[in-house]
Design a protein with these regions (language model features):
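Helical scaffold of the NTase/Pol beta-like nucleotidyltransferase catalytic core
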Residues: 1-102
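Short, hydrophobic/amphipathic alpha-helical patches that form generic packing surfaces
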Residues: 12-16, 135-141
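Residues in well-ordered beta-strands of folded domains
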Residues: 61, 122, 154-158
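Catalytic micro-motifs at enzyme active sites that drive phosphoryl/nucleotidyl and oxygen chemistry
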Residues: 89-91, 104-112, 140-144
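A structural signal for short, well-ordered beta-strand segments and their strand-loop junctions
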Residues: 101-104, 154-156
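Catalytic metal-binding acidic patch
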Residues: 106, 110-131
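Conserved catalytic core of two-metal-ion nucleotidyltransferases
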Residues: 137-158
Length: 158
């Protein structure tokens, strides 16, 4: 029997992922737990929580929220379609001489983008070039919007 800490951590983690309609695979639940446990203990605790936690198609979710499985699968399929374009846009941004790194963030980064998703990026700019990087990213966004894609440079650091 557990002291309740692990069970509480499992429920809190699943409740958080539920906000995003994102049931978790066992490995994801293990990774996102705020406490470190052995995978075997996690599986045991899930067995004890069978009235509060459901499991289907290798996904864990809060009981009564089984519909989010379909949502996750739809969003994963949609994200797969967008990923190639997002990588292409990221390569264009990364080719600018004052951009040191481009990282995809947001819902697309975790393959959970809905139909109206934009492309969220984190940019690492050369020293003293944050505003230049932002200006070019916003200018490039004006271009990509012609093709129905919105770029959002959510975080720009130097």
């Amino acid at each position: 029997m557990f002291n309740g800490t692990l069970e509480r951590a499992i429920l809190e983690t699943l409740a958080y992922s539920d906000v995003f309609d994102y049931p978790l695979r066992l490995d994801e639940l293990y990774r996102y737990l705020p406490i470190r446990v052995e995978i075997g203990k996690l599986q045991q605790a899930l067995g004890l929580l069978n009235e509060q936690v459901g499991m289907k198609d290798d996904l864990c979710f809060l009981t009564g929220h089984e519909a989010i499985i379909k949502i996750r699968k739809q969003r994963e399929a949609h994200s797969q379609k967008l990923t190639q374009r997002a990588l292409q846009y990221g390569c264009v941004l990364g080719s600018l001489p004052f951009i040191r790194m481009v990282a995809l963030t947001g819902s697309l980064a975790v393959m959970n983008s809905s139909g109206d998703a934009d492309f969220d990026y984190m940019l690492v700019a050369a020293p003293n070039r944050v505003w230049t990087a932002r200006a070019f990213a916003l200018l490039f966004n004006r271009f990509t919007r012609l093709f129905g894609h919105t770029l959002c440079p959510n975080l720009i650091v130097s």
